[in-house]
UniProtKB/Swiss-Prot annotation:
Catalyzed chemical reaction(s): L,L-cystathionine + H2O = 2-oxobutanoate + L-cysteine + NH4(+); O-acetyl-L-serine + hydrogen sulfide = L-cysteine + acetate
PANTHER family recorded: CYSTATHIONINE BETA-SYNTHASE
Assembly with partners or alone: Homodimer.
Native source organism of the sequence: Arabidopsis thaliana
Record-given protein name: Bifunctional cystathionine gamma-lyase/cysteine synthase
CDD domains: CBS_like
Gene name in the database record: DES1
Length: 323
């Protein structure tokens, strides 16, 4: 047998090909099977690693940025910023990020640990306000470049090229329903498009916070589910591939996230809990008996430990007695 060296050249070669696993312990009453795609297995623990690399590589190929010389500037909820900071560090880019002040402390710490410059913004200015501030910084930064994750076509494209094919391959083409949250819209658009091209009968269900049900025609509002529900319909979301919009409350998302940890052994972020809650609803419908639902878990739980999600166990941990 010929020996093969399987060592990767750099962090970017670790991105993608994340595993899927069946949910087994929280599925009482379900008539369909649910398989979760675990994007916390990415090198920086979220699905946003995919688009961070794709947007950087595309800009490099077009001559828009140069490693060691250019500065990446982006408005982010945290996970895309973490991906950009990681890849930026490995390729020699300075990274400047604008992030809502409501995002978790862990996000700030991780970004600073990766060398990124972080500017916190008031939640009231929304994505548009963040982008305006990013443009202000760009105007003062020679060699600056904004990837624009909300409108960059490489966002959905990388999911069309990787996430969708991985789900199709690992399910042996047996996936019937896709469930995913909507942040920038890229995951649902790219993945859903690929799967529907493979099988037009596959249903795509998207998840949004009940408290900010913009996709359903409601008004934007504050909510607990970090990572989805930006308060507007993102340009990268192709609603033509969406078959159903499912609303999940912050409380439902928190409870399901906790159950995933203590019953399935999966420590995931709150948007994963929201998507799981939606998948459970779909899996209990009689018309879905025997079907396979694939739900995307976008991130791991470690960057939410300071949030309301883990408030009770955090208090317990802080007050454990010394024996």
């Amino acid at each position: 047998m010929e020996d093969r060296v399987l060592i990767k050249n750099d962090v970017t070669e670790l991105i993608g090909n994340t595993p899927m696993v069946y949910l087994n312990k929280i599925v009482d009453g379900c008539v369909a099977r649910i398989a979760a795609k675990l994007e916390m297995m990415e090198p920086c623990s979220s699905i946003k690693d995919r688009i961070a690399y794709s947007m950087i590589k595309d800009a490099e190929d077009k001559g828009l940025i140069t490693p060691g010389k250019s500065t990446l500037i982006e408005a982010t909820g945290g996970n895309t910023g973490i991906g950009l900071a990681s890849i930026g560090a490995s390729r020699g880019y300075k990274v400047i990020l604008l992030m809502p002040s409501t995002m978790s402390l862990e996000r700030r710490i991780i970004l600073r640990a990766l060398g990124a410059e972080v500017h916190l913004t008031d939640i009231s200015i929304g994505i548009k306000g963040q982008l305006e501030k990013a443009k202000e910084i760009l105007s003062k930064t020679p060699g600056g470049y904004i990837p624009h994750q909300f409108i960059n076509p490489e966002n959905p494209e990388i999911h069309y090229r990787t996430t969708g094919p991985e789900i199709w391959r690992d399910s042996a083409g047996k996936v019937d329903i896709l469930v995913a949250g909507v942040g920038t819209g890229g995951t649902v658009t790219g993945t859903g498009k690929f799967l529907k091209e493979k099988n037009k009968d596959i249903k795509v269900c998207v998840v949004e916070p009940s408290e900010s049900a913009v996709l359903s025609g409601g008004k934007p509002g504050p909510h607990l589910i970090q990572g989805i529900g930006s308060g507007e319909i993102p340009a990268n979301l192709d609603l033509s591939i969406v078959d159903e919009i499912i609303q999940v409350t912050g409380e439902e998302a928190i409870e399901t996230t906790k159950l995933l940890a203590i019953k399935e052994g999966l420590l995931v972020g709150i948007s994963s809990g929201a998507s799981a809650a939606a998948a459970l609803k779909v899996a209990k419908r009689p018309e879905n008996v025997g079907k396979l639902i694939v739900v995307i878990f976008p991130s791991g739980g470690e960057r939410y430990l300071s949030t309301e999600l883990f408030e009770s166990v955090r208090y317990e941990a802080e007050n454990l007695p010394v024996e």
